[in-house]
């Protein structure tokens, strides 16, 4: 049986062929229809093996970029952004070199201005266009102008309704200002009227005074004429009577003018002259007693060893800048680990060396790379021929009892270092804190030597709950020490600027009364170093030691707690001492009326005021001749009556 396709072909051929004259009938039985066979591809598809994994497998792959949204963005610093940051750093450096602000204060203000990036870019354009030095004042001026320009732009964009509201607000403010101006004018008129009344009263009083003077002179003339009329027997008494008013008048003229007008009344006894010697002023009395305070730093204070820094705060390859007697210095350790101190000013262009770094025990200047050793000599000058005998000043430096000591005086320093800085036996150091205090160091020392103020000043810190005693007294002795009554506190002053105190504690945080420090079980030892940094500033080094609770040194972050407590106590004192300093600058005195419990501070002030004379006498080989110029070891031997006013 032929396939259906062949049957159709055969039928077509048979019907068209001319040779077939007769039609052949073929009878085909009914058969089931078969499905046509599948076509077999001639060439195999090379991608067919991939299509079995999916219709898109093996095609063009598109990577989804959604994962980039979760990737942290990395900020790329461009040249413009670096220039903006460089302007901030340059302004901080200029403020530090000028000494107008501390670097952290300038940086804080500049960082605040940089938060508004659009303003900061315009500030940079303004400073660059002006070709001015990048200082804080210049940047603040540029910021003000930028704010004005931006506000003008904002004003231009303001709607008419908003402008109308602003105009109404300004009108209300003008009306209020006019009312205040009218009130001020009325008060001024009242004050002028009162001034005129006072002038009239003063004129009346002046007339009365002149009239009384004429009356007194008339009475004197009458008395003299009466005595002269009695005869020569009373001539001597009349002469005495004449001399008495004359003497009084002469002394009255020489006496300094007072704020109130006083009237001299002549004695009725013309035979006895009146002693009218002028009394000394309180300022003269204070000067004679050595109690004259001043903001100036005596030159005689230079000839002492000063603990300038804690040893633990001066590791290797570290620069510690500080000021002493108004001069900049920087400390570091040399290649042997020994402390050194040189002037913080490069010998080349005056750049602060403390901005540089320590390279193999020598300080490298950050400006041109000059290097200086511990003696101040320049040892390296890159990019230029080396010049000898170039260097900076250096201070004698030593290390003892956990302190770095420097000698700022003239000539050779003392051979031995002080030995009182070490804590007493049985005590362990718990805290070492350095603070720059904006107070003259003498005022701060006097505050530390005064304990009578504690119940009134430190009511929120260590003296909380202390009752006010009936009396407070300091008992001094000749060993540069003494103790307070009724508090269990031993206190001492060590020249030139150190105070030591040992406090007896009943239990941690509480103090006992009516006993001495030696009678207490637990003790707290304090050392305050008040180094004269510059005029009106003190570099304060504070060390605290305890003879109990040794495990407390290992408590995490305990140093932060001690710093916070010390800052709180110092803040309570600082408000008062700054007020004293302000009154001193205005001509006032903090030694008008000393009290008995001021004994220790009084003797410090006497020693301080006589230190120049003391140094001069010691250089001349003479011993001290009076308590004002007495040495440190003798200043506690003055009697109790030196506190009398």
Curated annotation (Swiss-Prot):
Main location: plastid
MF terms in GO: 2 iron, 2 sulfur cluster binding; chlorophyllide a oxygenase activity; iron ion binding
Range of residues in the leader sequence: none
PROSITE patterns per the UniProt record, alphabetical: RIESKE
Pfam families: PaO (PF08417), Rieske (PF00355)
Role according to the record: Catalyzes a two-step oxygenase reaction involved in the synthesis of chlorophyll b. Acts specifically on the non-esterified chlorophyllide a and not on chlorophyll a.
Stretches for region Disordered: 1-46, 258-287
Keywords of the record: 2Fe-2S, Chlorophyll biosynthesis, Chloroplast, Coiled coil, Iron, Iron-sulfur, Membrane, Metal-binding, NADP, Oxidoreductase, Plastid, Plastid inner membrane, Thylakoid, Transit peptide
Location(s), subcellular: Plastid, Chloroplast inner membrane; Plastid, Chloroplast thylakoid membrane
Protein name (record): Chlorophyllide a oxygenase, chloroplastic
Gene3D superfamilies: Naphthalene 1,2-dioxygenase Alpha Subunit, Chain A, domain 1, Rieske [2Fe-2S] iron-sulphur domain
Reactions it catalyzes: chlorophyllide a + 2 NADPH + 2 O2 + 2 H(+) = chlorophyllide b + 2 NADP(+) + 3 H2O
Bilayer disposition of the protein: Peripheral membrane protein
Domain Rieske: 305-406
Enzyme Commission designation: 1.14.13.122
UniProt GO BP: chlorophyll biosynthetic process
EC category name: oxidoreductase
Coiled coil: 105-218
Biased composition (Polar residues): 259-271
Organism: Chlamydomonas reinhardtii (Chlamydomonas smithii)
